[in-house]
């Protein structure tokens, strides 16, 4: 690669910037002060142009994109014509209620500790849930396996086995391997 060729591709300081790029730079320049804008290199300006384009594309597609940091806290309108500073809902952020331990107890069922099963009694203890929707009713009738137990019986490997052993298949026909000698050994 020739070193002179790389310098020929770079724009010089006084070079004319194409109109399309200049328009994109003008869109971005309003987010910065004149001093900041003059200190920036062309490559930094291009990065900001692409950041704004990606943000606009994501929001047009309906995704919730994070507003780039350079676009925040400036008195400008966004690409859809909405004025950020005059938005009445701007400062009203929705506060989500925090989950406390008491609320979590109300949502998740209380699981009773398992007692050792007596020899004569085959039925299992079933955890009960307390809360407004269950009012102490049993979740599953005794003697019937729960859904998770059914799933484990059908698909899951047994304890003590390796996780991949249930994936191995048995060969239907016995394979006999023969020892193949090297041609170099036959020459002796």
From Swiss-Prot:
Q: Does the keyword Isomerase apply?
A: no
Q: Which residues carry this modification: Phosphoserine?
A: 123
Single GO cellular component term: nucleus
Q: Which UniProt keywords apply?
A: Phosphoprotein, Transcription, Transcription regulation
Q: Which Pfam families match?
A: SSXRD
Name the Gene Ontology biological process terms.
regulation of DNA-templated transcription
Query: Does the keyword section mention Oxidoreductase?
Result: no
Segment Disordered: which positions?
113-162
* Ranges for domain KRAB-related: 20-83
Which ranges are annotated Basic and acidic residues under compositional bias? 115-127
Q: Which family does it belong to?
A: Belongs to the SSX family.
Q: So what does this one do?
A: Could act as a modulator of transcription.
Q: What is this protein called?
A: Protein SSX3
Q: Which species is this record about?
A: Homo sapiens (Human)
**Lineage of the organism:** Eukaryota, Metazoa, Chordata, Craniata, Vertebrata
Gene name, Swiss-Prot/TrEMBL: SSX3
